[in-house]
């Protein structure tokens, strides 16, 4: 019933970073909006950013980044939002993805 009530309210967004919690926020408050704000504030094109995520609360950020990368343990919705994937955090997935990019600079 709670999910139905939240989902029925177009002004709310629900997401989760862990199976044991839920995040209910204003529809405009999400990681994608935060990334776009930060890019505008710093004068950086969002197309030049890389974001890593694994949960439903990362979906908007993965979509907003120029390069959205799903971790190996990512939930299906995060994988669908990403355009690349990497190994898990336990396997240094972020470093494994970034090192070739940094070496190419």
Explain the meaning of each model-derived region:
Residues 21, 90-92:
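A short, acidic, flexible beta-alpha connecting loop/helix-capping segment that sits on the rim
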Residues 34-37, 93, 97:
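Well-ordered alpha-helical segments embedded in enzymatic catalytic cores
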Residues 1-52, 56:
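Conserved acidic, metal-coordinating active-site core of Asp-based
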């Amino acid at each position: 019933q709670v999910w139905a009530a939240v989902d029925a309210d177009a002004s709310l967004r629900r997401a989760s970073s862990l199976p044991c919690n839920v995040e209910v926020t204003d529809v405009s408050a999400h990681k994608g909006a935060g990334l776009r704000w930060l890019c505008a504030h710093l004068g950086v094109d969002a197309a030049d950013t890389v974001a890593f995520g694994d949960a439903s609360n990362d979906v908007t950020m993965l979509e907003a980044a120029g390069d959205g990368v799903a971790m190996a343990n990512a939930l299906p919705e995060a994988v669908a939002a990403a355009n690349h994937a990497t190994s898990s955090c336990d396997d240094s997935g972020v470093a494994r993805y970034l090192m070739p990019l940094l070496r190419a600079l």
